[in-house]
């Protein structure tokens, strides 16, 4: 009996020992399958602080850059009109140097539905693009003009929209900058079908796709599906989440809404879109969080996904 008990103890000890010996091999095999390091260098737009090309609103550019820099985002985007206003006072270059956060892109809205304005619009877009270029920006986000959606008929303006986008994109790329269509709610290109119709018809040699994934979701589309369908053309992106609540025009800090952000980020990383992803959240007077708190919440979410920030 004693011999049998000793044998059982021996076999149990051996089994435990073999299990312990096998564990490092399993861990080593698992380690080899770890997700590759994230490469995206994610930036932030400035509208969260209320930075718009309106009298007085451009004053918020400095608080925006201060917070964007403090939280280690890699670059910023704003309106060229805002940049120009600060530059004319000799304050922009020193401010960018002070906060050590580079300009990546400028946001320009162009009239796409009125051919009589085309010539003047081209001149205006070129002038604003040169402001972006002056401060080492590399991308122009080309947005459609606003319309009254309840009475708007896309098909009536389809040809003008495509023609205008081709003209504007050619003018921007002639400067050596890249540009892409940025669909937006409340404009002449909002819905999924409008986006597909336009992107399948424009000259994509010049005009790429610069989607706002939150705007896509709010407009009724599956943002991840749209990004997947046009992935080879995606050269810039506004990374935004959508919750449909009363704050921030229905948007929210990343990770709090319905947009499939991990899938979208993995897709854009797979095609090498390293420096042209911009977090964005609309401003909200008396919102539940300060702009800085929304940035910190979003940053924490991105860090959980493996993204890194400047230190």
Where are these regions (language model features)?
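Active-site-proximal loop/turn and secondary-structure-junction residues that shape catalytic pockets
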Residues: 48-50, 80-82, 109-112, 144-148, ...
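Metal-dependent catalytic neighborhoods of phosphoester/phosphodiester hydrolases
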Residues: 85-92, 117-119, 154, 288
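Short catalytic-loop micro-motif centered on adjacent basic/acidic residues
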Residues: 75-81, 179-183, 210-212
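Active-site acidic/histidine proton-transfer and metal-coordination neighborhood
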Residues: 14-23, 34, 98-102, 115-209, ...
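The substrate-binding groove and active-site-proximal loops of carbohydrate-active enzymes
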Residues: 110-118, 252-255
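Acidic (Asp/Glu)-rich catalytic clusters
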Residues: 34-38, 65-70, 85-105, 126-136, ...
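Histidine-acidic metal/acid-base catalytic patches
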Residues: 2-25, 30-43, 48, 53-69, ...
């Amino acid at each position: 009996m004693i011999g049998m008990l000793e044998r059982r103890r021996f076999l149990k000890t051996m089994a435990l020992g073999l299990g312990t010996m096998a564990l490092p091999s399993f861990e080593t095999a698992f380690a080899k399958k770890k997700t590759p390091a994230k490469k995206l260098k994610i930036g932030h737009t400035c509208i969260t602080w209320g930075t718009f090309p309106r009298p007085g609103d451009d004053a918020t550019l400095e608080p925006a850059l201060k917070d964007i820099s403090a939280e280690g985002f890699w670059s910023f985007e704003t309106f060229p009109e805002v940049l120009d206003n600060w530059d004319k006072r000799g304050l922009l270059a020193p401010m960018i140097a002070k906060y050590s956060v580079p300009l990546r892109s400028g946001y320009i809205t162009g009239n796409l539905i009125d051919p009589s304005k085309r010539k003047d619009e081209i001149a205006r877009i070129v002038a604003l693009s040169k402001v972006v270029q002056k401060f080492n920006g590399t991308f122009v986000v080309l947005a459609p003009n606003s319309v009254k959606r309840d009475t708007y008929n896309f098909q009536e303006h389809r040809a003008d929209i495509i023609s205008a986008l081709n003209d504007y994109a050619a003018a921007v790329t002639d400067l050596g900058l890249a540009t892409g269509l940025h669909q937006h709610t409340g404009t002449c290109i909002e819905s999924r079908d409008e986006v597909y119709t336009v992107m399948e018809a424009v000259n994509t040699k010049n005009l790429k796709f610069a989607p706002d994934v939150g705007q896509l979701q709010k407009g009724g589309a599956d943002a991840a599906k749209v990004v997947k369908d046009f992935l080879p053309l995606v050269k810039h992106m506004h990374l935004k989440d959508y919750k449909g609540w009363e704050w921030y025009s229905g948007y929210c800090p990343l990770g709090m809404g319905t947009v499939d952000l991990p899938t979208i980020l993995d897709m854009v990383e797979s095609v090498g879109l390293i420096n042209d992803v911009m977090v964005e959240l609309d401003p909200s007077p008396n919102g539940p969080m300060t702009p800085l708190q929304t940035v910190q919440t979003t940053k924490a979410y991105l860090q959980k996904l493996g993204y890194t920030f400047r230190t």
